Each structure stands twice: as structure tokens, then as C-alpha cells.
Amino acid sequence: MSEKIYPVTKPVKARALIDKEKYLKWYEESVENPDKFWGKHGKRIDWFKPYTKVKNTSFTGKVSIKWFEDGQTNVSYNCIDRHLKTNGDQVAIIWEGDNPYIDKKVTYNELYEHVCRMANVLKKHGVKKGDRVTIYMPMIPEAAYAMLACARIGAVHSVVFGGFSPEALAGRIVDCESTFVITCDEGLRGGKPVPLKDNTDTAIHIAARQHVHVSKVLVVRRTGGKTGWAPGRDLWHHQEIATVKPECPPVKMKAEDPLFILYTSGSTGKPKGVLHTTGGYLVYAAMTHEYVFDYHDGDVYWCTADVGWVTGHSYIVYGPLANCATTLMFEGVPNFPDQGRFWEVIDKHKVNIFYTAPTAIRSLMGAGDDFVTRSSRSSLRLLGTVGEPINPEAWEWYYNVVGDKRCPVIDTWWQTETGGHMITPLPGAIDLKPGSATVPFFGIKPELVDNEGKVLEGAADGNLCITDSWPGQMRTVYGDHDRFIQTYFSTYKGKYFTGDGCRRDADGYYWITGRVDDVLNVSGHRLGTAEVESALVSHNLVSEAAVVGYPHPIKGQGIYCYVTLMAGHEGTDTLRQDLVKHVRAEIGPIAAPDKIQFAPGLPKTRSGKIMRRILRKIAEDDFGALGDTSTLADPAVVDDLIANRQNKATA
């Protein structure tokens, strides 16, 4: 583990919003007196009706989380209208297309008109407050307009990543009973079309079989590619917005009215609908965006995530726009036309703050320094990373080569469930250690506990819990509050359990060590092993499957599958390829297995439980100490798995 320390540099400290002294003072107040602290900082957004209650939360019993509950506000108003008087002509969104020669800029005045028109189209077709709208879009400005239009009229959006399959999309439509979908004829990624409208049509058929009927589909024209069309149901976005007014009053929303549902992987098969509400979420997204990235007026800020993930919600759309920032939306991929794309975009748009995932950093590091050094990158002031822990080697390369040793690397740990950054350095206050997410943000009380629930003090290695609520916290699992309590609050009573392992060093810095449950982190995206297993088992030749993660040089974690076939069938390379295709179709490319090992049997206890610990060790090519195997029903299975492992170290 790297123990190198990079102190805050003079230039960074000189312009920083928060220095060490202020961090310590604010942090102490935020945990000692959260009502006073958040009562003050809740005022960073505009309220139609000011709140008088700040925090009303309980992590025990029925678990209830409420912030600013008697206040009324509107997220779309805070992200657009309140900026118009003084900053209407400022650029809100810079859009950089998949094709490097195509881009556009959208000012706050233009954003207002686009969002109001889309909101009026939704209203015209019967969408009202509380209705769920599914958004299945590529990274184009209309995706942000759709989110903000829903927020404007009080509809609850559920954004589904454009890389997910029709089956995955259908499952999310069914779970929240969404009857209105916003999509696009086709997306573009790396020069290749993505059939979003065709996928949507397939998903709607699947949903209908489960008695959820989508009544309208609003289709944005992106490529002009051929798609199916259902008259009466399907609507062209460009035709619809021409028929409505360019203004739409924002609906007064209670702070605890739902804002969005975002599905995330759980350790059981069915994805969970993480529910975020209006007031607390926006306060937290905006505040973390400002202080973690040390955002100053006039900065150009670029987060490379997709709006289909929480990072896109909090740090492309809501946080930046609430702060009247200029946020860059990128439709493309890091290696198209070549591996220099990120650095060219930074030069082209004079980007000051750049936020990306360790997977992208590792892959670009592998492409060599020349792609980076042929660009100037002189506009860069701060680098951020998100999605998974960054290994010290990649951190050093990012700092030394991309940032020319002058930009702090802000390694942010947080989750879909947390709404915003939880453990992160503040650039002007915290010395950096490569590989460490460093220290908690204001109001966050981390605690390490062992497997028995004993609280660990000082330098320790354990399970990461948070002991008190913060405004950005998810409120429930949509439609299943018991699952919310069970998943997050039952393992360690009265504490929010993150599902991550963590080490705290002697300086009090936190190092995230990865998931401790059956959830994989592949390229910064969460995937439940159970989801991949059920996709494999749905293939007619597969009798049983077990999926584990293993260290992958680029993705962080790769997907290793043990597959037992139906009697009488042989495992072949053709079948292997077929299974990869099958999983891609069921879930999406993100879930494609890296290694498939055909196994006559899996290591099970006498009660029939699969011993995943053993499977993990074998997948990691580290089976010298498998631990206690005395409860195995058939120990010979293990020898066969070891002999046929797919991940043997090359001599």
C-alpha cells in the first residue's frame, strides 16, 4: 500500500474555498450539531416555503430519513430559473458528440426553453406529479432536458443506462410501473449505432407480458436511422416540442417528494430501485460539487460518466447546474477515434476540472504517454476519480503525466445510495495519499466494525458503516421498504452498512478495499453476481452457475463464471462464446463474462450452500490456503476446479 504523501500545494491552497482549519471546524460542527450545520447550508438552494425542521432521521426500527421536511422547493427551478436574471447567457451545457467534429453549447436561457417545452409535452400527454417516467437515452443534451422536465412537473424519473439490454430495461419499467418512456432512434458510441428505439420496443413487449403497459414513447431523433413505429403510441420529440409553449411554471414540491429512482445491483438477483427525494438530495449534490471540486465561477467542469449512473445524475446534471456551473456532456468513448480523445476534448473546451473512472485511467495508461503529452492540458486545475478504488500506480500516472504534477487528484468514495461524495479529500485542506479516499465529507460519520459488529478504533481493517444520516441519503427501495431495512440496516443494528471493506491508517485516512458482499465492481459499475448467475442459468444447456470477481488489470474486477452443464453436454469454446453473447443479451455488454470455466460440480457444503470463498481463491489463482474445507460434501470437486482453472499465471 502506498504511503507516499502529497501535501496541499501553495497555488491550490491559495485559491481553495476550504482550507485545513475551515475543514476541521466545519466537520466538527457538522457531526456535533447537524441541525445547526445543515440548517445553515440547506439555504444554498432556493425554497418557495422555507423549512423549519432540519433533520428527522432514525436508523433503527422502521428506519425513517427526512430532511428539511416542511420546506417546499423545485429542483428544476434551482438548476435553471434562479440563474437566469444574472447568468442567462452563460453556457450551462457543452455537448461534445461522439464524432470529434460535432459539438454544441447550450446557455441557461436556452436550457430553460428546452426543459419547459419538454415538460409541456409530458403534461400534454397526461404525465402528472408522482408518475414514473423511464428515460433510456444516449449522452445527448435531451437526456438532461428530460430529467429536468420531470423534476419541473413533479414526475419521478427512472434513467436506465443506454448500454442495458431490452430485458434489463423491461425489468425496470415493470418494477416502477412506468407508462411513459423517453428514448432516441439510435445512440452513437465509438462510431457505432446503438439501437435504443428497437430495444425499447422489445422491452415494452416484455413489460406488457407482465401487465405493465407503456402508453407513450417520446423519441428524440439522433441519427435518423430506421426504427419500428407504433402510431398512436410513439411520438417524435421534434414535432411535439413545436406544438407547445416555451415556458412552464415549476411545481412546488415538498422536500421529501420523490425526485428519481435509479436501479442498482444488489447481492440478490433483482436490481433495487434506489429512491432519492427532492430537497436533501439537491443540497448535498450541490454542496459536494462545489467544495470537493473547489468549483469557482467560470470553471469548465467535465465528468465523463453517463447519466444512466448516479455519477451522471449528481455530477453532470444536478450538482453542477444547481451551482450555475458549465458542465460538459460527452457522447463518445475514451478510445475513439483514438486513445487521445479525452486530452483533445480538454484542450478544445479548456476544461479546468476533470472527473473520470480508474478503469479509463488504467486503460489510457496502457496506451502510453504519447497520446497524453501531444496535448497541452494547460487548462486543467483538478483531477477526480470515481466508481472504484484507484490503485496507487494509476494514481501516480494520473497525477504525474495527465496533471503534470500540478493538479490534485481527488479520489471520491460514494455510492448510488449516498447521493453524493462521502469520503474524499478537499483539495485545499487535505494532503493526498495515492490510493486513499482520505477523510469524511461534512456530516459523514464513518465507523469500522468487525464481522461480529464490534467497533474498531484507531488503525484497523473492517466493514465500513455510517452511523448517522446525511441529506443526500436514499430514503427507501422503491416499493419495498422492508428490503431497504434488510439490505442496509440489519447487518449492524442502528448503522448504515455500505457493503464495502475498508482500512483506516494511523493518520485516520480511509482506504476502500472493495465489496464484502456478492456484488462485483466492473469498470466502476456495480453488478450483482446473482444477476449474472441467473442470466447464465436461463441458457438451456446450463444446469448451474456461480459467479465471482477476480483482479483485472483494466476493469479492476473481472467476471469469472463457473458453469455446470446439463448432463450429456460438453464444454466447448463455441459454447463459451455463446454464453458470453447470452449474458450480453440478458443484461448488457457491461456484464459480459471474462472467464468461463466448465465445472462438473461446484464446492458445496453438506447443506447445499456454494462455498464462494473457495471459488474466489481459485479464480484469483491463489489456492495455497483455501481455509477450512471440512464442511465440503465432495472435496474432490475442488481438485478438479484447480486443475482446470482459466486464470493460471503465465510463467
Swiss-Prot record:
It comes from Rhizobium leguminosarum bv. trifolii (strain WSM2304). This is Acetyl-coenzyme A synthetase. The gene is acsA. Catalyzes the conversion of acetate into acetyl-CoA (AcCoA), an essential intermediate at the junction of anabolic and catabolic pathways. AcsA undergoes a two-step reaction. In the first half reaction, AcsA combines acetate with ATP to form acetyl-adenylate (AcAMP) intermediate. In the second half reaction, it can then transfer the acetyl group from AcAMP to the sulfhydryl group of CoA, forming the product AcCoA. Gene3D superfamilies: 3.30.300.30, N-terminal domain of ligase-like (3.40.50.12780). It comes from the Bacteria. Mg(2+) binds at residues 537, 539, 542. Acetylated. Deacetylation by the SIR2-homolog deacetylase activates the enzyme. The lineage of its organism: Bacteria, Pseudomonadati, Pseudomonadota, Alphaproteobacteria, Hyphomicrobiales. Belongs to the ATP-dependent AMP-binding enzyme family. Its EC number is 6.2.1.1.
